[in-house]
Amino acid sequence: MRRIVNDRVKNMRDLGGYPTLDGRETRFGSFIRSNLPTGMSNVEIDRLLKMGLSTVIDLRTETEVKRKPNILNIRGINYFNISISAGFPQREEDIPNCYMDIVLNRDKMRLVFEVMINSKGMVLFNCTAGKDRTGVIAMLLLKLAGVYDDDILADYEVSYTYLRDEIRLMHVNNPDLPAFLGGSKMENMEMFLNLFNSKFKCIDDYFDYLGISRDGISVLRERIVL
């Protein structure tokens, strides 16, 4: 994992560099996970274009997009708004089930991965904080690559490290918000992984569930693994 440093976008990270169970490594420059790209300078945007960015998948709802447009929805980038709800957990222990609701949203998830399969160049996918909806997509990509579960958990947990100042401010400004909102505890991703593994025997079974062809699965795996 390598963080892409921007002044305003704190949780933008390349999924490259993770070791896999078969002794390989995930590719740099294929997939970027991110919180909402906003307030970026022309220099920062140009740097992404020079890295090969060609496609942006914005996972936010239409209401979220209208409230805060994605700064990367520009000429030269293929922008897709595939609206997925993050759910509304009432308690922290509800989070893993909310993540399962995301992966079981067959139509939307199939669209996400079909865009990735058909894209040429680097793909950036984002939601608002870049940790829940984005974290679920990142987990699926890393699992497809054969990345160790410990690294999948670490990739999820580090979101809070980069977002903690914004999250603290959110709670100061909204004191009635439940304390768990904004966090990215490893235990929540671990429980989600357990739910996922009990539902699907292997990651290929999940992509079969989505209706992704075997050729499509191979293309996606080849894009993320060296």
Q: Could you say what each language-model-derived stretch is?
A:
Residues M1-L124, I137-L226:
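Cys-dependent protein tyrosine phosphatase-like superfamily
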Residues A129, R133-T134:
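Ser/Thr-glycine-rich phosphate-binding loops at phosphate-binding pockets of nucleotides
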